[in-house]
A protein has these predicted regions:
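Adenosine-phosphate binding glycine-rich loop
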Residues: 3-11, 208-252
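Short, Gly/Pro- and small/polar-rich lid/capping loops
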Residues: 3-47
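Predominant activation on well-ordered alpha-helical scaffold segments within soluble catalytic domains
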Residues: 21, 86, 90-94, 127-138, ...
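Flexible, glycine/charged-enriched surface loops at secondary-structure junctions
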Residues: 30-36, 104, 141-150, 172-176, ...
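Glycine/serine-rich phosphate-binding loop and adjoining beta1-alpha1 elements at the start
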Residues: 81, 101-206
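N-terminal cap/recognition module
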Residues: 56-97
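Short beta-strand elements
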Residues: 46-52, 58-67, 163-166
Length: 252
């Protein structure tokens, strides 16, 4: 199993591969399975011709990487950005495979992207880019193949354009071709807040651990210094503020 030079800054894919190599060694993964899982199942590169509002024809590069379909259709977002790269998309697609597997969701991992600056594009230009990108990857996506979703600089509107374009080619409405679409088109309520809500759950659990640890520290401090717990809490807080202030002075 290959090793990665840790002296240089790793790309997104190299970082994923380095972590995968560590996990593979710990699991004693079969060499053949290791090779199969380390590389994506399919990489699609498209060149998207779009007529801009000025009448000028421009061409944008787009990608869709399907890392694994071993556990079901691949699943992953589509991102727009000037710094999008195939390497990044490749690494993020693999991470989607691991995320779905670790919580036992029957999907594989995928990711897509278009190199463009959405902040410099009009709504009409974004729509034309999205629809043409969808048409270019049409044969590789679908409810039973690969299901896109919003990601960086894409949203419900982007998914609505993808769904509409796919449905026009299918000659019937296909709601399940994307997730993250508007509720009016069959999207899930609460999807927009889902990531933030998940973060809230994690923070709540972590805060509970911190509060228990802090309470135990107060009790120990009170017992060791022969003071009541309220005084101990104040004294610990003062010590902590003094320590943080000193650290800022040292490292500022």
């Amino acid at each position: 199993m290959g090793a990665v030079d840790t002296q240089k800054e790793l790309s997104v894919y190299e970082s994923m591969a380095a972590r995968f190599d560590i996990a593979a060694r710990k699991l004693g993964l079969d060499e053949g399975l290791y090779k199969y899982l380390r590389m994506p199942n399919r990489e699609i590169i498209v060149h998207i011709p779009v007529v801009m509002d000025s009448g000028r024809l421009d061409v944008f590069d787009g990608f869709r990487v399907q890392h694994s379909i071993a556990r079901g259709p691949s699943k992953g977002g589509i991102r727009f950005g000037p710094d999008v790269t195939l390497d990044e998309i490749r690494g993020l697609a693999a991470e989607m495979t691991w995320k779905c597997a670790v919580v036992n969701i029957p999907f594989g991992g995928a990711k897509g992207g278009v190199i463009c600056d959405p902040h410099q594009l009009s709504q009409g230009e974004l729509e034309r880019i999205t629809r043409r990108y969808t048409a270019e990857i049409l044969d590789y996506i679908g409810p039973e193949r690969d299901v896109p979703a919003p990601d960086m600089n894409t949203n419900e509107q982007t998914m609505a354009w993808i769904m509409d374009t796919y449905s026009m080619h299918a000659r019937h409405t296909v709601n399940a071709v994307v997730t993250g679409k508007p509720v009016e088109l069959g999207g899930s309520r609460g999807r927009r807040e889902a990531t933030g809500r998940g973060l809230l759950f994690v923070v709540n659990e972590r805060l509970a651990d911190i509060m228990i640890a802090s309470f135990n520290d107060v009790v120990k401090y009170a017992d060791g210094h022969n003071v009541d717990t309220r005084t101990a809490a104040y004294m610990l807080a003062i010590d902590r503020v003094a320590y943080d202030t000193r650290m800022r002075g040292i490292y500022a």
